[in-house]
Amino acid sequence: MSGLSHLESEGCRNLLGMLDNDEIMALCDTVTNRLVQPVDRQDAIRAILVYSQNVEELLRRKKVHREVIFKYLATQGVVVPPTTEKHGLIQYAKSYWEEQSPKLKETAEPVKKTEDIQLFEQQAKEDKEAEKVDFRRLGEEFCHWFFELLNSQNPFLGPPQDEWGPQHFWHDVKLRFYYNTSEQNMTDYEGAEMVSLRLLSLVKEEFLFLSPNLDSQGLKCASSPHGLVMVGVAGTVHRGNSCLGIFEQIFGLIRSPFVENTWKIKFINLRIVGGSSLAPGSSLKPSVTFEQSDFEAFYNVITLCNTPEVRPNVRQILDSGTGDQVLCSGDEALLNKKEMNLPTPLKH
């Protein structure tokens, strides 16, 4: 549910009404991670209000321009210095909405208005429909959002479309990065800040462009009864006009319990293989090598490895090998299978 109060929602609704249709639809995509498809402008505004965690988060969005907030305050009779920066205007707006609230809080629950009842019924209907998640579509929408956002941080492609950062990950997210290019290596990263910065460096400092292959071979999805959704995607790696190789990436997504229909990244396995390291005769069209049953088994591996009883064995194994090796002793066959799928590295 929305983290905005009733007055904040009404104020932001009027403020958003000053944006044009393209800006509203783009803002809706950003706020909902492209997982909500509005049917019209009003539906998009409603989604923006419902899925925003708080009013500051919404007003700080790049697509909510400083001039729009200033114009809204002027229409409400709030006079502010024209040179006030955006963060100052946000505070003016918050103060204005707070002043509109009754000085004494009502002790009795107010009678719900007709539109409030309709909104509640609509939300309940959406919640019921959300239980039947199309994971294939969710995977496609997620990949479109993730790779567009990540690739837009490449300085050769102009200004970023939106802010990249740790807010898209769970705080204890884990990244396992395996690459086989001029050399072969595997590194683990942990924590939202560290994982976010490592992925960002691929496009911002190494100038890579990851192009996902979202057909039936390049994208596979699976879910667990605990709410973990796994998305596997393969694609090609580019720099400028050169295709450098292929990649395979597995995401573990968990729905946020605090923001409706919002998913955050719990773990990532990323494997990049340079074109010079591909086995002779390999097809350049990338495809996910895991089957649906492998996804489910891989989820079980991750779950087991987070238990205290298994973690010491995991560390021992990670310290002794390279590539996507065994995570837990009981699932050697599965992850050894993936290790076998890696192309034989070139000898130098």
From Swiss-Prot:
Q: This protein is called what? A: Uncharacterized protein C3orf38 homolog
Stated role: May be involved in apoptosis regulation.
For this UniProt record, give its keywords in alphabetical order, as a comma-separated list. Answer: Apoptosis
**GO biological processes:** apoptotic process; positive regulation of apoptotic process
Instruction: Enumerate the InterPro entries for this protein.
Output: NTF2-like_dom_sf, UPF_C3orf38
> Any transmembrane segments, and where?
none
Task: Show which residues constitute the signal peptide.
Answer: none
Per the record, what is one GO cellular component? nucleus
Q: Which Pfam families match?
A: DUF4518 (PF15008)
